[in-house]
Amino acid sequence: MNNPSETSKPSMESGDGNTGTQTNGLDFQKQPVPVGGAISTAQAQAFLGHLHQVQLAGTSLQAAAQSLNVQSKSNEESGDSQQPSQPSQQPSVQAAIPQTQLMLAGGQITGLTLTPAQQQLLLQQAQAQAQLLAAAVQQHSASQQHSAAGATISASAATPMTQIPLSQPIQIAQDLQQLQQLQQQNLNLQQFVLVHPTTNLQPAQFIISQTPQGQQGLLQAQNLLTQLPQQSQANLLQSQPSITLTSQPATPTRTIAATPIQTLPQSQSTPKRIDTPSLEEPSDLEELEQFAKTFKQRRIKLGFTQGDVGLAMGKLYGNDFSQTTISRFEALNLSFKNMCKLKPLLEKWLNDAENLSSDSSLSSPSALNSPGIEGLSRRRKKRTSIETNIRVALEKSFLENQKPTSEEITMIADQLNMEKEVIRVWFCNRRQKEKRINPPSSGGTSSSPIKAIFPSPTSLVATTPSLVTSSAATTLTVSPVLPLTSAAVTNLSVTGTSDTTSNNTATVISTAPPASSAVTSPSLSPSPSASASTSEASSASETSTTQTTSTPLSSPLGTSQVMVTASGLQTAAAAALQGAAQLPANASLAAMAAAAGLNPSLMAPSQFAAGGALLSLNPGTLSGALSPALMSNSTLATIQALASGGSLPITSLDATGNLVFANAGGAPNIVTAPLFLNPQNLSLLTSNPVSLVSAAAASAGNSAPVASLHATSTSAESIQNSLFTVASASGAASTTTTASKAQ
């Protein structure tokens, strides 16, 4: 710790006017005294006075030397706490000078930052003090009068400097020569620069130059810095940019150039700074934030997703990163350490991606398929736009088949000149849209029960394929249609009980898809004699709709006639016509009309379509069966009603598609309600709503039994099935049995 050259800098820092202080330069005020190569007697006296004020108030230089030794030892102990391995060896007589210098250098422990001009001035002042100290030691060793001379100097120090006489002249040249000799003898001592105590320093972190000149020492220290590991130097320059190399250019002794290095545990192993000073972190965070923002903008401009970046980095650099990691990096949600780790990799990938995107070879198939480029070339797929005409064709295909097979999708794609994957995705999306529009719970299937179209106070029983019979006077029960795949003639029974009412109601029932309301009747009021139900019996695309209504008539219904024209149904073997008359399968229309008890003049045979049949359902023959020979082949058609007695001619209802019940108004026991099935006017029964209109023309005071109409329209593989039944009852309940031929 003995430092003959270092003492020159802090020695003048204790030269202030504070007379009572004995600290090691901690409380001081610099008072630079301009001196040249030689000093005057007055300046020497002033320096001695300042030194006397700092050290002690005695009158003897011997006592001063002793106090200097004590303070220098305490300073050495404080200095050894930071640098414990420093030697302090000096001769007993010559130890006073370096010890005193080291004591005076205590003011530098606080690491004051001095300008070059201040350093030069302190060096000059230190030289002058060193000369005075050398002369004092020489005089002390020569004679015992040294004490008296010291007392004279200390006494004269209190007087103004202009009036101080020097009792013993000091030979400046000899003193300088002696000082140089002493310094040359102490060249083997280590010399250090004391810096701020908050800086953690280690002895191995000082760089000592052995050149005698200050400027050469500075250059040597810079050369030594360049020989440090590159990682440590990067840490040094980043963590301590304000630390500069210091030197003592004016001293002829060894100069010191020391640069403290911030202690970093991982500075030798990783090129990234883990623990950085708090003053430098904001700039690094700002740099990372700016890079993250720039990276996101450039990535989007290139058309890559965050997942593409992670995949490409895994293929190119061997480090797989997820989309979440890239997203958190762009949002600055990663730790500082991970951000620093990702930044160089992302920066490298970004540069490579930009270079590849700008390269013309990227557009060639060979470049796209080359290793390492796959991750970079995978761009975000654009949204497919489908033209209107193609969309209409797809909608039509969807209505036909909602879930086509792979082969059907391929055929559709070839027809529309579209990609198969696009067609497949469109069908998937369209099915999801259909589920949102029509949830599965709202649609009926073959296993769904019969649902009431409108609420009614009368009890409506949802039936199964078995026969359901109700004995209540105000209840109408309907059995649903049997499965449409049945080929045998089956008897279906519709049972109703008659009742009397005092008013007439007009009922309108429109057939419609089962999912929607199929009853529109502003004049229909829920009554004991009116009810409706719908049964949905479907297999694949088959649909069956059953509608039942009861309309009161003003007079007893004596005879009902049904005329059926069908040109598409295949006849099946069944029982012959029973009751009033039995006809062969090839009976003519006139014979059938006569057997039915219908006047041929009411409906001429020429009005019947080819293969038509006229049926008679008398109250006495309601238990009979209809021969399938009376029902020829025809598609489903609309129902028209003809008024008895010619009040409504047949031709007047050809274009309306309505079924009209009307009273004859004449003899109550002779009422006919013929039904005419016209295939030309009623060919859209299963696709468009068809009305069944019931109207009464009699007075409101007449009483009449209830006539029940059971109309069932089915849509099977092709629209070819129909079943129409009219049941009337007078008095007791009777059963009407009809035959239905189903494909």
From Swiss-Prot:
UniProt KW Glycoprotein keyword: no
Residues that bear Phosphothreonine: T270, T276
A GO term from the CC aspect: intracellular membrane-bounded organelle
Main location, first listed in the record: nucleus
Keyword line: Activator, DNA-binding, Homeobox, Nucleus, Phosphoprotein, Transcription, Transcription regulation
GO molecular function, one term: RNA polymerase II cis-regulatory region sequence-specific DNA binding
Post-translational note: Phosphorylated by PRKDC.
Ranges of the DNA-binding region feature: 379-438
Expressed in which tissues: Ubiquitous. Isoform 2 is lymphocyte-specific.
Comp. bias regions, Low complexity: 81-95, 357-371, 505-557
GO BP terms: negative regulation of DNA-templated transcription; positive regulation of miRNA transcription; positive regulation of transcription by RNA polymerase II; regulation of transcription by RNA polymerase II
Domain POU-specific span(s) in chain numbering: 280-354
Subcellular location: Nucleus
Protein name according to UniProt: POU domain, class 2, transcription factor 1
